[in-house]
């Protein structure tokens, strides 16, 4: 896949050939697995539906990271029944890791059970942050957030892949993740 086949969806928000082709192939495969399910995907396939089952797909979370060959970037797939999430799977490409969970069950990384950290004090918390592409609208919130955390949290990182960072929280690598204005495919 050519990292240079890229379009700009909006200012600083990119879509690559890989996003589109990954989405096409995932939808094709999932359609055979559960034909009655609808789809909502980041690159525009499908929309929120009233169908009983709906796949929620981000075919390449962390597109900017992918374009620049920087980890992490991943594929994220969830299945919902109306508004209730039933399962989620995230494949983090750079680390070759597969995170998954089923509602009412445990969370796993490559078949091994994972847990969130037991850190409960902000001073010790290692926190992932995310900011949306529309930076002008979010600028006051982002500035306030960074100001509040700087010097109070044990550390912060901006990694560029919401799905991967949330999995890292589930595995105890991060203690929390903070971001507003996410799409349904990001979580």
Model-derived segments and spans:
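Short, solvent-exposed loop/turn motifs
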Residues: 85, 113-115
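Generic detector of well-ordered alpha-helical packing
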Residues: 20, 24, 43, 59-62, ...
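DPxDG-like acidic metal-binding loop motif
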Residues: 49-108
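Residue-level signal for inorganic ion chemistry
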Residues: 19, 30, 63, 92, ...
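A structural micro-motif
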Residues: 4, 37, 105, 153-154
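An extended, acidic
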Residues: 115-187
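N-terminal subdomain of lithium-sensitive/metallo-dependent phosphomonoesterases centered on the IMPase/IPPase/PAP
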Residues: 1-60
């Amino acid at each position: 896949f050519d990292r240079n086949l890229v379009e700009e969806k909006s200012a600083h928000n990119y879509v690559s050939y890989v996003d589109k082709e990954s989405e096409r192939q995932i939808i094709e495969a999932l359609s055979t697995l559960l034909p009655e399910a609808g789809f909502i995907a980041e690159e525009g396939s499908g929309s929120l539906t009233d169908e009983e089952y709906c796949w929620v797909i981000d075919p390449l979370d962390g597109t900017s990271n992918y374009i620049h060959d920087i980890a992490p970037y991943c594929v994220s797939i969830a299945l919902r029944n109306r508004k209730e999430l039933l399962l989620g799977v995230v494949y983090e490409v750079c680390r070759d890791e597969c995170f998954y969970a089923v509602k009412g069950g445990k969370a796993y990384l490559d078949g091994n059970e994972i847990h969130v950290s037991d850190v409960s004090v902000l001073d010790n918390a290692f926190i992932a942050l995310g900011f949306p592409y529309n930076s002008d609208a979010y600028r006051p919130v982002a500035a306030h957030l960074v100001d509040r955390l700087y010097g109070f949290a044990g550390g912060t990182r901006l990694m560029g892949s919401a799905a991967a960072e949330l999995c890292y929280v589930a595995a105890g690598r991060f203690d929390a993740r903070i971001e507003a204005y996410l799409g349904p495919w990001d979580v």
